[in-house]
UniProtKB/Swiss-Prot annotation:
It catalyses: hydrogen sulfide + 6 oxidized [2Fe-2S]-[ferredoxin] + 3 H2O = sulfite + 6 reduced [2Fe-2S]-[ferredoxin] + 7 H(+). The gene is sir. This is Sulfite reductase [ferredoxin]. PROSITE patterns: NIR_SIR (PS00365). One of its GO terms (biological process) is sulfate assimilation. Monomer. SUPFAM superfamilies: Nitrite and sulphite reductase 4Fe-4S domain-like, Nitrite/Sulfite reductase N-terminal domain-like.
Length: 555
C-alpha cells in the first residue's frame, strides 16, 4: 500500500518563509528599486520633459508612492472600464492625494491647499473618507512646485498611495473632546516621523491602513491596524489593539487582539504589527495580499503569539474592550471643547469642496481667531477653537459657502467616492450624482424627516472596491453596468442594505438580483425609507429592521 505524500505548501511569497522571488508584476516592480526613489526622476526628468517622457512602470506603479494616479480620460462610459482599455482611459493628468495624518491642519495649511487647488487643479478639491485631500487635473510639470508649497506648511503626499502605510486616521477632536479616553496625537505624529517615507515599510504586500483615536470616531473596524481608547481597570487609560479590517471585494471586520497598549508604546507596537504584515503577508495574489487574509488564516491567537515572540520580544498586557457605539460619531454641529471654546463641524456633500471654498474657510477662521481645522473620516470638516461670541458669525459664513453645521439627514449621512468623473476603475457616476441626489432626497422626504430619529447612511461607490464603504452603510450602492432591458447596458448599482459599525457591527444584506439604474436612486431610497418608517419598531435602527424586513419592502 502506497502512502500519499502530503501536498507541498504553495509559495505565497511570504518573506519570513524565504519566499523572496517576485510572483507578480507589482512585486517585480518593487524589487527592481525602491518606489520612493521615483521622486528624483519626477523632479529632475519628468517635470521638465513632460508627461510623454514618463516611463510606464513609473507612471502606473511607482508614482503611487508619491500620491499620484493618472485620472480617467473624459468621454468614456462604464463599458470601457477595465485593464484592457487602460491606454484609452489614462489621461495626461493626475489625481494627487495629500495626506493629512490625524486630519489635522493649521489655517495656513488650509489656505495653501486652497491656493494649490485654484492654481494647479482647476479649483478641484475633495475631502476623502480617510481625511485626505484629493486634487484632479494635476500636470506633472507642476508637481515639484506643489510639493514645495506643501512642505512649507508641514504637508506631504509621501506614501499617500501604494503598498505602504497610508494616512493615519485620528479623531477630529483629539486632545479637545470631552468624551475621549486619552489624546493619542503624539503617537500619530511619532509614527509619521519615524516610518513614513522610510525604507523599512516602503515595500509592504499591499496597502496598509491605520486608525488611532481616543474614541470610536475613525471607523476602526475597517482598518488593517487600529488603536482605540479604553480604560484598563488596573493600568488606566490606554488603547485597545485591533487588526485585520478592510472592505473591497472581500470585506472583513478587524478583530481585537485582546491587548491593552499604553500610549507611549503605540509606535513600537504599530511597527511590530506592520513588520508581521511585511514579513508574513501574502505577495502572490494582489487580491489576497491585505493583512486581513493572513489574520483569517492564522487566527488572532497565532498572530498575537508571533507578534509577541518574534517582534516585540515580550508579552502584551491583556485588556478590556471599549463599549461599542450605536451610531457613527461624525462631529457635525457645534460641540464644546475641553479648552472652553467650540468646534463647528460642517458637511459638504460627499466631501466635495474646492480651492475657492477652502480659502474662504481659512478667511473665516482668521476672523474667528482659529488656527486649527480637522478633516474627518466621514468626508466632513471641523473648525476648532471658536469663542461663543463669534460662533453665530462663523456659522453664517459657512452656510453662505454651502457648508452646513445643521444639515439634513441626507446631506449629513451620504458619502461617495470619486466615481467615473475621474476614476479609471469606476463604472458609474457617484460624487457628481450625489450633488443632485441630496437636494432631491431633502425635497422628496421632507414630510417624514421629523420621524427619523436615527441616522440612515447612504454610501455610493462606482466599483466593487468600496472606497466609499458600501458594505457598512445602511443603504450602499455598488456601481456596475446593468441590463437596460433592450439588449444594451446602462450605468447602475447593486444594492446593499443594513451595514453597520459599532454596536451590532456587520455587513449589508445584498438583495438577490436587485439592481437600480443611476436615474432610479432617488426613487429607490424614497421607497425603502418610507417602508422603514412604516414598519419599524420603536427605537429600531435601520440595520436592525433590514434583518427582519420582508424582501418586498426592501426592493
Amino acid at each position: 500500500m502506497t502512502t500519499a505524500r502530503p501536498a507541498k505548501a504553495r509559495n505565497e511569497g511570504q518573506w519570513a518563509l524565504g519566499h523572496r522571488e517576485p510572483l507578480n508584476a507589482n512585486e517585480e516592480l518593487k524589487k527592481a528599486g525602491n518606489p520612493l526613489d521615483v521622486r528624483e526622476r519626477i523632479e529632475n526628468i519628468y517635470a521638465k520633459q513632460g508627461f510623454d517622457s514618463i516611463d510606464k512602470t513609473d507612471l502606473r506603479g511607482r508614482f503611487r508612492w508619491w500620491g499620484l494616479y493618472t485620472q480617467r480620460e473624459q468621454g468614456y462610459d462604464g463599458t470601457w472600464t477595465g485593464d484592457d482599455n487602460i491606454d484609452k482611459l489614462e489621461a495626461k493628468y493626475f489625481m494627487m492625494r495629500v495626506r493629512c495624518d490625524g486630519g489635522a491642519l493649521s489655517a495656513a495649511a488650509l489656505r495653501t491647499l486652497g491656493q494649490i487647488s485654484t492654481e494647479f487643479a482647476r479649483d478641484t478639491a475633495d475631502i476623502s473618507d480617510r481625511q485626505n485631500v484629493q486634487y484632479h487635473w494635476i500636470e506633472v510639470e507642476n508637481v515639484p512646485e506643489i510639493w514645495r508649497r506643501l512642505d512649507d506648511v508641514g504637508l506631504q503626499t509621501t506614501e499617500a498611495c501604494g503598498d505602504c502605510p497610508r494616512v493615519v486616521l485620528g479623531s477630529p477632536l483629539a486632545g479637545e473632546s470631552l468624551d475621549e479616553v486619552l489624546d493619542p496625537t503624539w503617537a500619530i505624529e511619532e509614527i509619521v516621523r519615524r516610518y513614513i517615507g522610510k525604507p523599512d515599510f516602503a515595500d509592504l504586500p499591499r496597502k496598509y491602513k491605520t486608525a488611532i483615536s481616543g474614541l470610536q470616531d475613525v471607523a476602526h473596524e475597517i482598518n488593517d491596524v487600529a488603536f482605540i481608547g479604553v480604560n484598563h481597570p488596573e493600568h488606566g487609560p490606554g488603547l485597545d489593539l485591533w487588526v485585520g479590517g478592510g472592505l473591497s471585494t472581500n470585506p472583513m471586520l478587524a478583530q481585537r487582539v485582546g491587548a491593552w497598549v499604553p500610549l507611549g508604546e503605540v509606535p513600537e507596537v504599530w511597527a511590530a504589527v506592520t513588520s508581521v504584515f511585511r514579513d508574513y503577508g501574502y505577495r502572490r495574489l494582489r487580491a489576497k495580499a491585505r493583512l486581513k487574509f493572513l489574520i483569517k488564516d492564522w487566527g488572532i491567537a497565532k498572530f498575537r503569539e508571533v507578534l509577541e515572540t518574534e517582534y516585540l520580544k515580550r508579552p502584551l498586557i491583556d485588556g478590556p474592550a471599549p463599549e461599542p457605539v450605536k451610531h457613527p460619531i461624525d462631529h457635525v454641529g457645534v460641540q464644546r471643547l475641553k479648552n472652553g471654546l467650540n468646534a463647528v463641524g460642517v458637511a459638504p456633500i460627499a466631501g466635495r469642496v474646492s480651492g475657492t471654498i477652502l480659502t474662504a474657510v481659512a478667511d473665516l477662521m482668521a476672523r474667528a481667531g482659529s488656527d486649527r481645522i480637522r478633516f474627518t473620516p466621514y468626508q466632513k470638516l471641523v473648525i476648532l477653537d471658536i469663542p461663543d461670541a463669534l460662533l453665530d458669525d462663523l456659522i453664517a459664513g459657512l452656510d453662505a459657502l454651502g457648508l452646513q453645521s445643521r444639515p439634513s439627514h441626507w446631506r449629513r449621512n451620504l458619502m461617495a467616492c470619486s466615481g467615473i468623473e475621474f476614476c479609471k476603475l469606476s463604472f458609474a457616476e457617484t460624487r457628481v450624482r450625489a450633488q443632485h441626489l441630496v437636494p432631491e432626497l431633502e425635497r422628496r422626504l421632507e414630510d417624514i424627516n421629523s420621524q427619523l430619529d436615527v441616522p440612515i447612511t447612504v454610501n455610493i461607490n462606482g466599483c466593487p472596491n468600496s472606497c466609499a464603504r458600501i458594505q457598512i452603510a445602511d443603504i450602499g450602492f455598488k456601481g456596475q453596468m446593468i441590463d437596460d432591458g433592450h439588449g444594451g447596458s446602462v450605468e447602475g448599482f447593486q444594492v446593499h442594505l443594513g451595514g453597520h459599525l459599532g454596536l451590532d457591527a456587520g455587513f449589508g444584506r445584498k438583495l438577490r438580483q436587485h439592481k437600480v439604474t443611476s436615474d432610479e436612486l432617488g426613487d429607490y431610497i424614497d421607497r425603502v425609507v418610507r417602508n422603514f418608517v412604516k414598519h419599524r419598531s420603536e427605537g429600531e435602527r435601520f440595520a436592525q429592521w433590514v434583518i427582519r424586513a420582508e424582501e418586498d419592502d426592501l426592493r
